[in-house]
């Protein structure tokens, strides 16, 4: 999603280097880090890539030993999650490495470390320069093997898939077409090719991503088919890896990331070859008999793009309603959450509405706009019924500040600004917010300290209709507090089970060797897991979804 990263990946793919170093800075008290990396390493990383990291590390060590500079290797920084400047190049056949120098923006021109040493900008530059020269020297020394192994890596991409599956199938039926298009855009940026199967295929053996169990599936024309035998087979196999194998439980980042989970798409890993039926292109049958002056426009709210359209309509001042009950109109069945824009109450905005929805109907995959010439439904409530609720454009505030996670804040802000294109107010800290000016307040993950007065004001505001969205750690401020209905524990039976588990852990912790302290401390951490969440899709928060959803917990 980041435009800077998109530019970097595009530039990288033009050059396809044999060696790639991602230069970073870490805390001021840490010595220099260079490869070889720590475990875990993803199984796609080859023996040569591992060995070459050792070769280059040896050259770097010699350069530092001569100067008496401190360094460490094989700790902290692993090669598992494919989003970094060392792993991503690795999965493109290069020797990818992270180099970390103590410093960061805090260090400035010089800073005193905890042991009383003065760390200067000049010394930090000297260290990075030393590893740069040593790395180039190592690459030159091993150039013949580098070229040979790089060529073999990419030859294997087209001849022998790196992942566990011959192909990946994203069925058109039951998937959000808009998200399928988002996925293909991601694949395009990685140079990964895809097609659609030939029609009338027989069922083939596969892995169902939703259960991680073997099954059979019948590929159909219109489905998205990604063959593993292609120039970027390795990165494809990693990005679609449903259950990555960990060689070490201590890892720098998340342990689950498969794109079908990230995009909320049904997916099957095929264990046999499936013939392509040509280029994949999502198409939807548009209404050829367009009603020029409709009674109402109906927007099928089953894709995230529907929220973007709703945002555009609200910014224009259009009056939009949402259905709380399924209905049938114009020969089409519509679910809860469907948006309805009637001519009545929008008389002065008809041209703007038509322009917005005409463009959306053409350009947005998975978004269906239906024009009807009557408010009389064939089944379910009529369009003038109280089952269609007016949607007020909310005034939204997003909390920022020192104690708010910049990553969580950025995620929320990006969603509103780049995806929904909806205006929000950024407020620095909960102390400065005037709740009367907002309908919705979003608290990203963070460490909030709310006093009794603030809690009372928030409670009154929520009671009067304000909507408070607390994410992750922000929920701690309201857990086990009277009137908020949020508990850290479950029912009595759940709590007893939790206490039994805690007692068992306490006993094992009590007698564990001190050397295992770090591992014991992360025993209950889940840095990457996929949860199947049951949804009540009669509730407005779940409109547009099915009865369950796969979500990645990071």
Regions found by a protein language model. Give the residues of each.
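Intrinsic-disorder/low-complexity accessory segments
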Residues: 7, 11, 15-16, 29, ...
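Histidine-centered divalent metal-coordination motifs
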Residues: 22-26
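Mobile, glycine- and charge-enriched loop segments
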Residues: 1-2
């Amino acid at each position: 999603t980041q435009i800077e990263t998109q530019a970097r990946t595009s530039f990288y793919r033009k050059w396809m280097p044999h060696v790639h170093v991602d230069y970073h800075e870490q805390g001021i008290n840490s010595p220099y880090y260079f490869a070889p990396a720590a475990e875990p390493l993803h199984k796609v990383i080859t023996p040569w890539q591992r060995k070459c990291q050792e070769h280059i590390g040896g050259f770097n060590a010699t350069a530092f030993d001569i100067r008496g500079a401190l360094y460490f290797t094989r700790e902290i920084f692993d090669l598992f999650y494919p989003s970094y400047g060392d792993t991503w190049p690795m999965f493109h056949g290069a020797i990818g490495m992270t180099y970390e120098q103590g410093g960061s923006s805090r260090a400035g021109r010089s800073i005193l470390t905890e042991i009383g040493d003065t760390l200067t900008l000049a010394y930090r530059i000297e260290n990075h320069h030393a590893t740069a020269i040593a790395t180039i020297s190592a690459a030159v020394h091993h150039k013949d093997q580098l070229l040979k192994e790089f060529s073999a890596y990419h030859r294997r991409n087209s001849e022998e898939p790196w992942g566990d599956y011959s192909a990946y199938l994203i069925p058109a039926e039951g998937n959000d077409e808009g998200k399928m298009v988002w996925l293909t855009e991601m694949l395009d940026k990685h140079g990964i090719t895809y097609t659609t199967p030939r029609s009338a295929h027989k069922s083939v053996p596969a892995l169902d991503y939703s259960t991680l169990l073997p099954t059979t599936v019948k590929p159909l024309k219109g489905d998205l088919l990604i063959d593993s035998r292609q120039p970027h087979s390795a990165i494809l196999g990693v990005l679609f890896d449903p259950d990555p194998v960990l060689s070490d439980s201590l890892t720098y980042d998340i342990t689950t990331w498969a794109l079908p989970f990230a995009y909320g798409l049904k997916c099957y890993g095929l264990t046999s070859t499936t013939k392509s039926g040509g280029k994949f292109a999502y198409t939807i049958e548009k209404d050829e008999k367009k009603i020029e002056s409709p009674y109402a426009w109906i927007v099928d709210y089953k894709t995230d793009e529907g929220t973007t359209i709703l945002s555009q309509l609200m910014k224009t001042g259009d009056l939009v309603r949402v259905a709380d009950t399924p209905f049938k109109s114009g020969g089409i069945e519509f679910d809860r959450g469907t948006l309805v824009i009637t001519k009545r109450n929008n008389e002065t905005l008809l041209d703007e509405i038509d322009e917005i929805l005409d463009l959306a109907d053409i350009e947005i995959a998975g978004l269906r706009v239906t024009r009807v010439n009557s408010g009389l439904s064939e089944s379910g409530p009529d369009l003038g019924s109280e089952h269609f609720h007016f949607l007020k454009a909310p005034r939204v505030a997003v909390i920022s500040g020192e104690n708010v996670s910049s990553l969580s804040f950025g995620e929320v802000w990006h969603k509103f600004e780049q995806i929904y294109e909806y205006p929000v107010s950024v407020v620095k800290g909960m102390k400065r917010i005037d709740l009367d000016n907002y309908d919705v307040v979003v608290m990203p993950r963070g460490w909030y300290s709310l006093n009794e007065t603030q809690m009372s004001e928030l409670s009154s505001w929520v009671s009067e209709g304000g909507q408070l969205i607390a994410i992750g750690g922000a929920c701690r401020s309201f857990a086990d507090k009277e009137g908020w209905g949020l508990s850290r524990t479950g029912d009595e039976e759940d709590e007893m089970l939790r206490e039994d588990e805690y007692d068992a852990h306490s006993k094992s912790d009590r007698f564990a060797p001190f050397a295992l302290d770090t591992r014991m401390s992360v025993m209950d951490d889940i840095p990457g897991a996929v949860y199947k969440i049951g949804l009540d899709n009669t509730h407005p928060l779940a409109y547009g979804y099915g009865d369950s959803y796969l979500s990645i917990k990071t």
